[in-house]
Amino acid sequence: MKSIVVLFDEKNKYEEEKVFSDKSAKELCLSAAESFGFEVRTISGLSTISELLEELDKICSESGAESLIFSYADCLFLNKTLTQGLLSTHFDYKAEYTFAEGYPEGFAPEVLDKGTIAILKELSKTTAKATGDQKITRHSLMDIIKTDINSFEVETVLAPVDWRLFRFAFDCRKKETFIACQKLYESGISNEDAVELSEYAAKSAEILKTVPAFYNLQLAQKCQGQCTYCPYPAELLKKEGVKACEAAKVMSFDNACKLIDQIADFSGEAVVGLSAWGECFNNPDLLKIIEKILSYEGLSVLI
């Protein structure tokens, strides 16, 4: 049965970095995809799930492929053996959508029947339009399928150990995952063994802890709330002799900007929380601080 491999290229800033034995993640991913033995196409320039499905349906029609193997162009650890297992399960059980569960993200592609793609394309424009209009993410195909999941024959290839709790993502979409890829590649373990790679990653401090993805900033001492289990008022009174509801100190805009600049430089992509202790709305420069955070493409705000 004819299949085709499609890699979606997000054009992220790290995928072209030649740090993997003088090769980039994009080059290694393409090489891995070509080892599957099928035609490989790389697509880009799409923004919504609906647009993605439209393009995938078009590719199936043009190529005459009965099934489509989908992944992202920066997944340098794309695994041939795992992919073969997915295809075997997909065809043996006549599945419409097959994916790997429990393995780190970036090791396995997703497999779809061409008819499933056509159906999802229509769903993304009609009953599931709200999902279809969403920006493409690494979970887009599953997200659109979940809108009517009982209508599809979905099969799963399970990992021998559930590594999901580690939240691994071996791709190069951001600095955090890019560094993890570098450290895993430096281990020298063959890409052919997804289990050995996963076991190594789960024990490697360099992979588990790359750069922070979340920061908490306290913008104001004052807090009008009276939470039964909150230790903040008692500790503030003990250390500084002031009640939380009467505290007056706030972080200056200049100091906040310095911290935000350092966060952006160090982590690249991160969530900045503004509700560590105290009530951030007591800082008169709150809106300016939020604007400063959002001036960096890789930073977002949590209040």
Map each language-model feature to its residues.
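Short beta-strand-to-loop acidic/aromatic patch adjacent to the donor-nucleotide binding site
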Residues: 65-76
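Conserved nucleotide-sugar donor-binding
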Residues: 107-122, 175-177
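Conserved alpha/beta core of the MobA/IspD/sugar-nucleotide pyrophosphorylase nucleotidyltransferase superfamily
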Residues: 137-212
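Basic phosphate/pyrophosphate-binding loop/patch that engages nucleotide-derived ligands
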Residues: 85-96, 116-136, 147
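Conserved alpha-helical substructure of the radical SAM core
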Residues: 205-303
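Active-site nucleotide-sugar/metal-binding loop of Leloir-type enzymes
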Residues: 51-67
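N-terminal glycine-rich phosphate-binding loop and ensuing alpha1 helix
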Residues: 1-44
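Conserved donor-nucleotide/metal-binding helix-loop-beta segment in metal-dependent transferases, i.e.
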Residues: 76-105
